[in-house]
Amino acid sequence: MNSSQISLKMKHGRVNMQKKPSKCSECGRFFTQRSSLTQHQRIHRGEKPYVCSECGSCFRKQSNLTQHLRIHTGEKPYKCNECEKAFQTKAILVQHLRIHTGEKPYKCNECGKAFCQSPSLIKHQRIHTGEKPYKCAECGKAFSQSVCLTRHQRSHSGDKPFKCNECGKAFNQSACLMQHQRIHSGEKPYTCTECGKAFTQNSSLVEHERTHTGEKLYKCSECEKTFRKQAHLSEHYRIHTGEKPYECFGCGKSFRHSSALLRHQRLHAGE
């Protein structure tokens, strides 16, 4: 065997060694590349060798650190060709694109409602299960979403860190500020595919869409009457509890609905 044949055989052997799958000794999972196995094994060891110089957060992969650093730099390299909106990660861009395409791959097994994002489906499913995993340490009130708990906690602290540059109004969460700013800009990015009506908030669009579908997700536990909105169920439930939270400061009379209080106050104004 000459030197060129030996060299070819050695090269062929290295290719075969590289292609041979590597097995994780902890969980038995196979990987085609040794580097992928090395990254995977950090899950078992809890090893996070890539450290953010800005805040000290640690990561298992260099790619995860690179993605995280965009929080500090504000870099958003992934741009939507439809609306020019930009994002920090490709995954978020893919989710955003479904707003334009109308694709909703995540479907609820209970009611068939579909969503463009997996987290939206998980949040929705809590309507059916009644699960409220996020609990306030101050008052014990529980919530189905972490963002609702965060917003609620600011009701105890009074913190409103998000301020409108146009009018100075402050809010306890950034989403509320973004929604408010659409009053000034006139932007209504959420459009009904049935009738073309546009809304400033996605939640308003979701509620509106139920007028077309007839869907009523919110059910009274006392009389089983159903409603399209949680707010309507809450108002209805006061019939059973007798609660009248809206009090007239003029005469002390109380009402179940704010609209009833307003009508009553006009009687005083006309006196």
Curated annotation (Swiss-Prot):
Transmembrane segments: none
InterPro entries: Znf_C2H2_sf, Znf_C2H2_type
Gene Ontology cellular component annotations, sorted alphabetically: nucleolus; nucleoplasm; nucleus
Principal location: nucleus
UniProt entry tagged with the keyword Zinc: yes
GO MF annotation terms: DNA-binding transcription repressor activity, RNA polymerase II-specific; RNA polymerase II cis-regulatory region sequence-specific DNA binding; zinc ion binding
Zinc finger (C2H2-type): 22-44, 50-72, 78-100, 106-128, 134-156, 162-184, 190-212, 218-240, 246-268
Keywords attached to this entry: DNA-binding, Metal-binding, Nucleus, Repeat, Transcription, Transcription regulation, Zinc, Zinc-finger
Keyword Nucleotidyltransferase listed: no
Subcellular location(s) per record: Nucleus; Nucleus, Nucleolus
GO biological process terms, semicolon-separated: Golgi organization; regulation of cytokine production; regulation of immune system process
PANTHER family given in the database record: GASTRULA ZINC FINGER PROTEIN XLCGF26.1-LIKE-RELATED, ZINC FINGER AND BTB DOMAIN-CONTAINING
Function: May be involved in transcriptional regulation. Essential for Golgi structural integrity.
Family: Belongs to the krueppel C2H2-type zinc-finger protein family.
Protein name: Zinc finger protein 501
